[in-house]
């Protein structure tokens, strides 16, 4: 299930549907239902009544609270059912075939500037690099490169990192940590 249908949620729906998965989707807001169903998902009208034991994972949008100020009820239901919670970035990492370097940037301030700058420098050096994640295109909407033909420079929020148990970028950049 994809829960939280903003731009990253829709990208996750499209990616999972394109990969042949049966996709369920939900949101506290019903406004994106039609667009979500057109993208290949079955809409879950009441996520609080859904059987999470039937799922492989729940992909949470970055804005869905996992811990603070309190977990969203969907998080509690999924965890109680033994269903893993993951982010779109985790899904992006799992979808990679072959080896194309991934540079992941996080921190309180300066993520977007650093992400854009690294991608620009790599491109100026003659490499093929694309910036995405929380800057520009969602990670799951980035082009799929042939093995070794491109570098992904991804801006990642702390909320997404919490839900990336297997994501292993080739380079990780932690800019700073300050109260926000």
Positions of the model-derived regions?
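Phosphate-binding loop of NTP-binding sites
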Residues: 53, 66-180
